[in-house]
Amino acid sequence: MATKKSGGSSGNGRDSRGRRLGVKKFGSEKVIPGNIIIRQRGTKYHPGKNVGIGKDHTIFSKISGFVHFRKGVYNKTFVDVLEASSVS
């Protein structure tokens, strides 16, 4: 009979899933009210015209239109939603 006890399984070998952050709707994409445009930690992107910001810094659309990114003062990136009539 063998006197060596069999080894147990390791307690490791797991990892947490990714956070699924990032840009969900890119420039010139059509959005409707409530569409999530960006999921982020902190304000890497700042809310501009016709968008709102959630408590977890998620930027979402308030109107139907098209996504537009622009640089503001101090090189901040702003996200706007432009109405279809104002897009040229």
Curated annotation (Swiss-Prot):
Swiss-Prot/TrEMBL keywords: Ribonucleoprotein, Ribosomal protein
Superkingdom of origin organism: Bacteria
Pfam family, one: Ribosomal_L27
MF (Gene Ontology): structural constituent of ribosome
Key word Ribonucleoprotein present: yes
Gene Ontology cellular component annotations, sorted alphabetically: ribonucleoprotein complex; ribosome
Residues passing through the membrane, by range: none
Region (Disordered), start-end ranges: 1-24
One GO term of the biological process aspect: translation
InterPro entries documented for this protein: Ribosomal_bL27 (IPR001684), Ribosomal_bL27_CS (IPR018261)
Xref: HAMAP family: Ribosomal_bL27
Family designation: Belongs to the bacterial ribosomal protein bL27 family.
Protein name, entry field: Large ribosomal subunit protein bL27
Organism of origin: Ehrlichia chaffeensis (strain ATCC CRL-10679 / Arkansas)
